[in-house]
Amino acid sequence: FFGLGADGTVGANKNSIKIIAEETENHGQGYFVYDSKKSGAATVSHLRFGPRPIRSPHLITKATFVACHQPQFIDKFDLLGPAVEGATFLLNTSEPREKAFDSLPLEMQEAMIRKRIRFFVIDAYRVAKDSGMGGRINTVMQTAFFAISGVLPKDEAIAAIKHAIEKTYGKKGEALVRRNFEAVDASLAHLHEVEVPQAPTTTRRRPPVVS
């Protein structure tokens, strides 16, 4: 999960690990990498879960799910490098569904075609703004992850997310909880799968990637 220090991505992923551990038979672990000047700097959250206890934290090199919470990152990082064949890629973008694939640099398009990656998009900032959440897209992206990952049945996942919201924000007032609930429900309506074509649709290459 690629995010920014101020967008709530790390906090949402910590909540996701708790939900997975509490609601399934799986063990979960999070490993978080971010700049010391966290606010405004890139963060990368590595989530692992499975039926056996996970002992040692490390970076994920074979990912079945990759999420980009900030659209500008498509030109800054090799987001799909760790993705395995058949992985799922979730992108926060303001591009309409029919133009989302075209907006990607050539390297990403080629990787998606070669690895047969499933592609989902959501305009998380629009959903957050319309729900009264400002720029905090964490709830929106967390909902999208659970909706398409299959870690939990969707209805169970939504109920678990809302329960976590009540625990996290309940003391801050009913209005904040309600706004988060609205963001969860709106996320499902604004999440779309994009058909990946058989050939690239651009010649635009990504600038040199930041390692």
Residue positions per predicted region:
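Active-site cofactor/cluster-binding pocket
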Residues: 2-211
